[in-house]
Amino acid sequence: MAKLSTDELLDAFKEMTLLELSEFVKQFEDTFGVTAAAPVAIAAGPVAGGAGGEAAAVEEQDEFDVILESVGDKKIQVIKEVRALTSLGLKEAKDLVDGAPKPVLEKVAKEAADKAKAALEGAGATVTVK
């Protein structure tokens, strides 16, 4: 297979739809074991006492799904937040919101999941993190 230059790759990406690019990113992440999520810096708070020994024994989950359960009465604000979190187009974001319950983000870090949950709940949605 001929090696493509960076410019050729960028030209190919410019011709793809957002859905095609989203699928490409997912396959790229799976193939190379990386994530395209932007790192989020959050200061760690003090750990609550009493469960220190047990918490160390249980393996901590490191990937979370953000599930949009219901929209509430501020549908437009929720669509705007979904677009900001996922880089989806207007139609795709509206379809996702209309089809609730649906996952908004999958396999993201705890900090990113908590940030997304707070943003969506601030817009009036009901959200769970699994």
From Swiss-Prot:
Biological classification of the source: Bacteria, Bacillati, Actinomycetota, Actinomycetes, Frankiales
Pfam family, one: Ribosomal_L12_N
InterPro entries with a match to the protein in the record: Ribosomal_bL12, Ribosomal_bL12_C, Ribosomal_bL12_C/ClpS-like, Ribosomal_bL12_oligo, Ribosomal_bL12_oligo_N_sf
Subunit structure: Homodimer. Part of the ribosomal stalk of the 50S ribosomal subunit. Forms a multimeric L10(L12)X complex, where L10 forms an elongated spine to which 2 to 4 L12 dimers bind in a sequential fashion. Binds GTP-bound translation factors.
Coiled coil: none
GO biological process: translation
Taxonomic source organism: Parafrankia sp. (strain EAN1pec)
Function: Forms part of the ribosomal stalk which helps the ribosome interact with GTP-bound translation factors. Is thus essential for accurate translation.
Keyword annotations from UniProtKB, A to Z: Ribonucleoprotein, Ribosomal protein
Family named by the database record: Belongs to the bacterial ribosomal protein bL12 family.
GO CC terms in record: cytosolic large ribosomal subunit
Name this protein carries in UniProt: Large ribosomal subunit protein bL12
SUPFAM superfamilies for this protein: ClpS-like (SSF54736), Ribosomal protein L7/12, oligomerisation (N-terminal) domain (SSF48300)
GO MF term list: mRNA binding; structural constituent of ribosome
